[in-house]
A protein has these predicted regions:
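Short beta-strand-loop/turn "lid" adjacent to the catalytic site in phosphate-handling enzymes
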Residues: 66-99, 127-133, 162-183, 206-209
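Glycine-rich phosphate-binding loops at beta-strand->alpha-helix junctions
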Residues: 209-217, 262
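Phosphate/pyrophosphate-binding loops at sites that engage ATP/ADP/AMP, CoA/4′-phosphopantetheine
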Residues: 60-72, 144-148, 194-198
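N-terminal glycine/serine-rich phosphate-binding loop of ATP-dependent small-molecule kinases
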Residues: 1-94, 122, 222-231, 359
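Short, acidic/turn-prone active-site loops that include or flank metal/cofactor-
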Residues: 97-104, 260-262
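Short alpha-helix plus adjacent loop in nuclease-associated cores
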Residues: 101-113
Length: 361
């Protein structure tokens, strides 16, 4: 009987459960469950629906039971930087705000009161992006200081789902590095930096590496899904898992991972935290086996995903692409990487405004 292994891959627009097993020396992958994802407005903030998403994770496990393919182990990967803060009773503090929310506006300047951008990059090797965990935490500190006072635990999104599955609190390395608070030298939290910024040390769990066993399903989840398995931390940052899957047999390769974001880069054995790299805004995200994903963040499918949502998902992605191909006379060129497209009210309106002002043509 085949041994099955379950990957739960949750992106910014959808999630999927994929079962894998070996057959005649080859890995066979089977998607068994899929669900929608996206941010919703709550109290004026763009938030993730983590309660609903976790129900979908559990529903996918129930699907395994239904089809008679019980996995030996599983792990969850997601996008980077976002997190929850838990109080002493493990309750989420505040809204589950997502990285496209505007709460981080101006927070870079607050961080730079404690450390310059140049010195911050030299310490972490992570790109300047206003949505990084370091700036999100500064927004919490400035706008809801009571949350930091009450917080006992910080968990990034995949770590939070692993906690809900097992009851065990962990922080996986590749995901943690995206937040700009981890040292590429020690491969641990930069506690000196954390102290400089006034973030409570006690929130930050010990980092674990990909491949670390976290634990078995809790009694509650085991009873609900009808079986038990081991939860093992993958490279929980989705790009980390994608790069690990690149079919390259040597170190000399370039990868492009495309989803809501597109990431283009290489693998390195050491981080490049030079001033030149800082000026180019390249990032050194943690990878498997202590390597670094030296890459550039590029706008991916977010714009077409947003256009689809603006028309209430009336068309499939294939239909939207077909309509775009039919509109051959399209005179403008748009800089899709411009920050105005990070979280506009509507992508189509932003493009029209840009076209009128010639700002991005």
């Amino acid at each position: 009987m085949a041994a099955y292994y379950l990957a739960v891959d949750i992106g910014a627009s959808s999630g999927r459960h994929i079962l894998g097993h070996m057959e005649n020396g080859k890995m066979v992958l089977e998607e068994i469950y899929r669900f929608e994802n996206g941010m919703v407005k709550k109290d004026g903030e763009l938030c993730w629906e983590f309660d609903r998403l976790f129900k979908e994770v559990v529903n996918g496990l129930k699907k395994c039971k239904e089809i008679g393919k019980i996995p030996v182990s599983m792990g969850v990967d997601t996008w980077g930087v976002d997190f929850v803060l838990l109080d002493k009773d493990d309750k989420v503090l505040g809204n589950t705000v997502g990285y496209r929310d505007h709460r981080t506006e101006g927070m870079d300047k607050e961080v730079y009161k404690a450390i310059s951008l140049k010195d911050l990059y030299a310490r972490t090797g992570i790109q300047k992006a206003d949505y990084n965990t370091i700036y999100q935490l500064m927004a919490v500190k400035k706008k809801h200081p009571e949350y930091l006072e009450q917080a006992e635990t910080l968990l990034h999104v995949p770590d939070y789902f692993h906690f809900l599955l097992t009851g065990q609190k962990t922080c996986e390395y590749t995901e943690a590095t995206t937040g700009q608070l981890v040292s590429p030298i020690t491969k641990d939290w930069d506690y000196e930096l954390i102290d400089m910024l006034g973030y409570p040390r006690k929130m930050f769990q010990k980092l674990i590496m990909p491949g670390t066993g976290i634990g078995h399903l809790s009694d509650k989840i085991r009873e609900e899904v009808g079986f038990d398995l081991e939860v093992v931390a993958p490279a929980t940052h989705d790009t980390g898992s994608a790069v690990l899957a690149v079919p390259a047999n040597d170190d000399d390769f370039i990868y492009i991972s495309s989803g809501t974001w597109s990431l283009m880069g290489i693998e390195r054995k050491e981080a490049d935290c030079s001033e030149k790299s800082c000026e180019m805004n390249f990032t050194n995200e943690g990878g498997y086996a202590g390597r670094f994903r030296y890459l550039k963040n590029i706008m991916g499918l977010w714009m077409i995903q947003s256009v689809r949502h603006e028309v209430n998902d009336a068309y499939s992605f294939a239909e939207i692409c077909a309509m775009a191909e039919e509109a051959k006379d399209f005179p403008s060129r748009v800089d899709a990487n411009d920050e105005c497209f990070l979280s506009p009210d509507t992508v189509s309106y932003t493009h029209l405004r840009a076209h009128e002002t010639d700002s991005y043509l």
